């Protein structure tokens, strides 16, 4: 078992889910990690933990979304855990920094939500964080995104799916 696996197991064990649906996912994720020593890695065929972060600029009331090149959807930043990731939060912060080009992002201390979804590669057991951007932060598009854009809170429901809207609602409640 890797250090990242141990950290992900601890995070899921200690996380206080905000409702019954999230608690059921928390238990399912924890069980998956108990059953799969490789459950944090892309190679785990039955599904794997991923880490994402919704980049928020609370001073401007906006969030940064990336237009995923392969899926064609406006999403929060995030992706697969990598061997150099020591913690789940570190993986989420790395992904957010790489995909947004914004330095000085700061994660809220615990996950905001969990979201399980099927992708072309496997089932993703996504652990979602909120990342606070410095006021006036400027994003720089990466090769992983077709586009990168700031949206006012009230615009998100018109461009993103329900999972992103729920992540925004939960993240704002944690601010």
Each predicted region: which residue ranges?
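Conserved Nudix-box catalytic region and its N-terminal flanking loop in Nudix hydrolases
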Residues: 59-97, 102, 154
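Active-site segment of metal-dependent pyrophosphate-handling enzymes
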Residues: 101-137
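Actinobacteria-biased recognition of intrinsically disordered, low-complexity terminal regions
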Residues: 1-8, 171-175
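Acidic, metal-coordinating catalytic segment for phosphate/diphosphate chemistry
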Residues: 14-52
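Histidine-centered active-site/metal-ligand motif
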Residues: 48, 68, 80, 98, ...
């Amino acid at each position: 078992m890797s250090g990242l696996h141990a950290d992900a197991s601890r995070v899921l064990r200690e996380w206080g889910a905000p409702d019954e649906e999230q608690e059921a996912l928390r238990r399912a994720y924890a069980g998956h990690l108990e059953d799969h020593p490789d459950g944090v890695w892309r190679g785990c065929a039955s599904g794997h933990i991923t880490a994402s972060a919704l980049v928020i600029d609370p001073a401007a009331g906006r969030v940064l979304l990336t237009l995923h090149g392969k899926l064609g959807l406006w999403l929060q930043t995030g992706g697969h855990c990598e061997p150099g990731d020591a913690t789940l939060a570190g993986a989420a912060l790395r992904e957010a920094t790489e995909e947004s080009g914004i330095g000085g992002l700061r994660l809220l201390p615990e996950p905001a939500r969990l979201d399980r979804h099927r992708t072309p590669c496997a089932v993703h057991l996504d652990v979602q964080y909120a990342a606070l951007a410095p006021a006036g932060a400027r994003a720089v598009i990466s090769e992983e995104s077709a586009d990168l854009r700031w949206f006012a809170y009230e615009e998100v429901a018109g461009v993103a799916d329900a999972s992103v809207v729920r992540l925004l609602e939960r993240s704002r409640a944690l601010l």
